[in-house]
Design a protein with these regions (language model features):
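Hydrophobic alpha-helical connector segments
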Residues: 61-85, 259-286
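Extended non-catalytic domains of envelope/secretory-pathway proteins
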Residues: 135-139, 227-228, 244, 270, ...
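Helix-turn-helix
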Residues: 1, 5, 9-43, 206, ...
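An amphipathic alpha-helix adjacent to DNA-recognition modules
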Residues: 3-4, 16-17, 37-61, 196, ...
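Amphipathic alpha-helical segments used for helix-helix packing
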Residues: 79-101, 282-302, 339-343
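Amphipathic alpha-helical packing segments from all-alpha helical-bundle domains
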Residues: 98-123, 132-133, 302-327, 335-336
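Hydrophobic/aromatic-rich alpha-helical bundle segments in the mid-to-C-terminal region
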Residues: 122-187, 325-369, 379-384
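Conserved small-residue-rich
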Residues: 139, 185-253, 342, 346-349
């Protein structure tokens, strides 16, 4: 009962905004009684996240080799029954010590390995790199339901999620090479002369790596070689830095979208190019992507509402294109498909072992096209070229 109450509160309000007294009140006991079960909020978060991971992913690691389609359908149903997994793992588990996150992460790695084995058993032509990418992407489809707020009747919803997982599992992808230097190389890249821009870049990286709550102005100042108090010459507060970073990412995405719409006349071509441009943005700016996924809750009310509305408006542009290409598709189905594409792209961008492989941009693009029901003709920056691969299962 305590774990269930904590899970709901952490997902609804965010770990940083929930006190042990809030959890105690939710289960009708005093705070002192709660501390007899858990020594602190962090221990409770660990228990909540571990339980969610085991409940959602346990079936993958214990399943025997067999019907991949049936396994994916069962996983789709489980992911919908435990929709909190994505929020808990991607957003809230950042508040745990590194060793505990690594321990919990082994649940995901075990599930990924199990899925990769199932995929290679069903598709003997898959190499290790592609099997790993497809397995991670199937997990990301499951995680994406945490960020979906749609009303689909049963069995339509699990059938749709299972279909998306199946599209990933059967996708024929371009070459995926060895690991290359991370992008962009922070060790070799030139830095802006502007002190404000240097502070913004350093803070964005620190917020992404440690979480907003764990970073001080002194940390940011040290990263660029100035005293923490000097930051006030450029930003009024730590919150203003976060708001500036969020605004920077939003404006970049809208500029990309505007350029896409101005460069093509066909909705399908626009959607293909938008998938590519979003993948390019995410892979090059993984720290900004991390802030979008994990730190929005730390914005002050006005900035948070403005940021969320901007994100909703941006996604609505994707939905408009999807439904222009597929007029019979319901708004709810289009939203589920788009969220799956964005979640896969974001997670790959935030996962070094995937992000740093040569050819990853083209692979992400192909997966996105498959999930949105586009053919294998890749529209690339103003020209159409047919890639020499086998079609995805449609």
């Amino acid at each position: 009962m305590v774990v269930a109450a904590a899970r709901e509160l952490f997902c609804r309000h965010g770990y940083a905004n929930v006190a042990m007294s809030d959890i105690a009140t939710a289960v009708g006991i005093g705070p002192s009684a709660l501390y007899r079960h858990f020594r602190g909020k962090q221990e409770l978060l660990h228990a909540v996240t571990a339980e969610a991971l085991e409940s959602c992913l346990g079936g993958l690691t214990t399943a025997g080799r067999g019907d991949l389609d049936a396994l994916l359908h069962e996983f789709a149903e489980t992911s919908l029954a435990r929709r909190e997994l994505g929020v808990l793992w991607q957003r809230e588990a950042r508040n745990l010590p590194a060793e505990q996150r690594a321990e919990l992460g082994e649940h995901l790695h075990a599930a990924r390995r199990a899925l990769a084995e199932q995929l290679t058993a069903a598709r003997s032509e898959l190499d290790h790199a592609h099997a790993e990418l497809l397995a991670w992407s199937i997990l990301d489809v499951a995680v994406s339901v945490s960020y979906q707020h749609v009303d689909l009747p049963a069995p339509d919803y699990p059938n749709l999620i299972a279909d998306l997982m199946r599209r990933v599992a059967t996708a024929e992808l371009p070459d995926l090479g060895d690991h290359i230097a991370d992008r962009p190389s922070t060790e070799q890249a030139l830095e802006p002369r502007s002190r404000r821009e240097s502070l913004l870049a350093a803070a964005t990286r620190l917020f992404a790596e440690r979480g907003y709550a764990a970073v001080t102005l002194e940390d940011t100042g040290t990263a660029v070689g100035i005293a923490g108090q000097s930051i006030y010459n450029h930003f009024a507060s730590k919150h203003d830095i976060l708001a500036a970073a969020m605004n920077r990412s939003a404006e970049r995405l809208w500029l990309d979208l505007t350029e896409v719409l101005a460069s093509v006349q066909d909705h399908a071509d626009a959607l293909r190019l938008l998938i590519l441009r979003y993948a390019r943005f995410a892979l090059a700016h993984q720290h900004l992507v991390t802030l979008i996924v994990t730190e929005t809750e730390h914005l002050q009310d006005d900035d948070r509402q403005r940021t969320l509305q901007t994100q909703r408006d941006y996604i609505d542009e994707w939905l408009h294109l999807v439904r222009a290409v597929h007029p019979a598709m319901s708004p709810a189905e289009a939203r589920v498909r788009v969220q799956a594409v964005l979640t896969i792209t974001n997670d790959i961008a935030r996962t070094p072992r995937l992000r740093t492989r040569s050819g990853i941009e083209e692979n992400v693009h192909r997966l996105g096209c498959s999930l949105l029901g586009l053919d294998d003709t890749a529209f690339v920056e103003g020209r159409t070229e047919v890639t020499p691969t086998v079609r995805s299962d449609r």
